[in-house]
């Protein structure tokens, strides 16, 4: 009945990577999983303005290595690396093991579904007209080379009494093609008249020969010591 599988989970292990890459026995698995959850929760609360697109956690030899993909690395690193060092110490206390933090810069945030969704959420919370925010996001993403994008908002749009859903799409967004590199994220805008949901799908192209998706817009940083359519439901 029109229900869609999560595009990222659908492609996991085929063209998408896991966000946590470690192995554990039965006794340690729950502990590691809980530790990962607390670390991600801590980073989300501490780095709300850093435009974080992804956090990858690895656990080599009784330590934890965290790679933060961000569009604003300067906010995380801080002056002479002071902020990232404080962050490292806090994560070591939460995880209970020595930690290492790597920063990877997202060169084109307009091609990242999470950052696009958060941008739309921020504009809606600042009372920007939702249609304008959606159209601007679609235009910027297509201009930077995406093959297609779909943006959907739902809730009490513009404060009306009855909730509804509106969406814009430009280009192709083939959700059932496993080799299609689809980036997806859902976010929420908290307004005075309720919560508005924002969903973003971005089609970056097809990945052939069973190769895993590699984000071309990311560069590691070592801290110092077609046609537009409109729809309504």
Curated annotation (Swiss-Prot):
Domain KH type-2 residues, every copy: 39-107
Top-level taxon: Bacteria
Any GO MF annotation of the entry: rRNA binding
SUPFAM superfamilies noted in UniProt: Prokaryotic type KH domain (KH-domain type II), Ribosomal protein S3 C-terminal domain
CDD domains to which the protein is assigned, alphabetical: KH-II_30S_S3
Annotated Gene Ontology cellular component terms: cytosolic small ribosomal subunit
Keyword check for Transit peptide: no
Pfam families cross-referenced by the UniProt entry: KH_2 (PF07650), Ribosomal_S3_C (PF00189)
InterPro entries assigned: KH_dom (IPR004087), KH_dom-like_a/b (IPR015946), KH_dom_type_2 (IPR004044), KH_sf_prok-type (IPR009019), Ribosomal_S3_C_sf (IPR036419), Ribosomal_uS3_bac-typ (IPR005704), Ribosomal_uS3_C (IPR001351), Ribosomal_uS3_CS (IPR018280)
Gene3D superfamilies xrefs: 3.30.300.20, Ribosomal protein S3, C-terminal domain
One biological process term in Gene Ontology: translation
Key words, A-Z: Ribonucleoprotein, Ribosomal protein, RNA-binding, rRNA-binding
Subunit and partners: Part of the 30S ribosomal subunit. Forms a tight complex with proteins S10 and S14.
Family annotation (NCBIfam families): rpsC_bact
Function: Binds the lower part of the 30S subunit head. Binds mRNA in the 70S ribosome, positioning it for translation.
Family per similarity comment: Belongs to the universal ribosomal protein uS3 family.
Listed name of the protein: Small ribosomal subunit protein uS3
